[in-house]
Amino acid sequence: MAASAGPEIERLIALLSKLPGLGPRSGRRAALALLKKRDTLLAPLATAMAEAQAKVRTCGTCGSLDVTDPCAVCADGSRDGRLLCVVEEVGSVWAMERGGSFKGRYHVLGGLLSALDGIGPEALRIGELVGRVADGSVAEVILALPATVDGQTTAHYIADRLAKTNVPVTMLARGVPVGGDLDWLDDGTIAQALRARRPA
C-alpha cells in the first residue's frame, strides 16, 4: 500500500481486497475508482450497502436471500412445491431464476462437503433438507450442484441420506461442464440441463 494512503483508505483497500475475485492490486484500483467518483459511485454504493445490511435476510425455509422471510420464491403459491432444487449457494438460485426454466422451489445448502476444507454435513443445511423432504410434500429432489469433486461428493451424500424417503433424487444432466458453476452458465445451458436431468 502506498505510504501516502491514510488509515481510512488502507482499510477500504483491505476490505475490498477480501471480495471474491479481488486481490490487493484490484482492491486498490476499486478503492481509487470509488474515491474518484464519490458522489456518483461511492455515496450510492454506501447507501445500497447500508440498506442491504439493514433489510436483506436469509429465508428461514430455503436459505436464499431476500428482504422478506419467507422469500418471494417460497411465498409464491404458483410455484410447484413438489419440485425441490438443491443448490450450493444463493448465486445458483439467481442463475436458475434468470433462466426462467424452473418453476419449483429451492434449498440452498450454504456450501459443499469438503474433506480438504474440513466442511462436514453438520456445517451445511443438509438436515433441513432431509426435514423438508420427510414432510411428504416433495415429489422430486433435483441436485443442481457443481460438477466438481466436492459437488459430486455432496450429491452422493444427499442421495444416500434421502434414499429411505422413496423420493426420486435426480441430478442436472452433463450440460453443466465439469468444474463449472451455475453462476457462469448461460440460460440455454441451464434450461437444457434441467430438461435432461437423470437419477442420482
UniProtKB/Swiss-Prot annotation:
InterPro entries: DNA_Rcmb_RecR, Rcmb_RecR, Rcmb_RecR_Znf, TOPRIM_dom, TOPRIM_RecR
Source organism per UniProt: Caulobacter vibrioides (strain NA1000 / CB15N)
NCBIfam families according to UniProt: recR
Domain Toprim: 82-177
Zinc finger feature spans (C4-type): 59-74
Function: May play a role in DNA repair. It seems to be involved in an RecBC-independent recombinational process of DNA repair. It may act with RecF and RecO.
Cited Gene3D superfamilies: 3.40.1360.10, 6.10.250.240, RecR Domain 1 (1.10.8.420)
Assigned protein family: Belongs to the RecR family.
Classification via CDD domains: TOPRIM_recR
One GO MF term: DNA binding
Protein name as annotated: Recombination protein RecR
Coiled-coil region list: none
GO biological process: DNA recombination; DNA repair
Keywords for the protein's UniProt record, in alphabetical order: DNA damage, DNA recombination, DNA repair, Metal-binding, Zinc, Zinc-finger
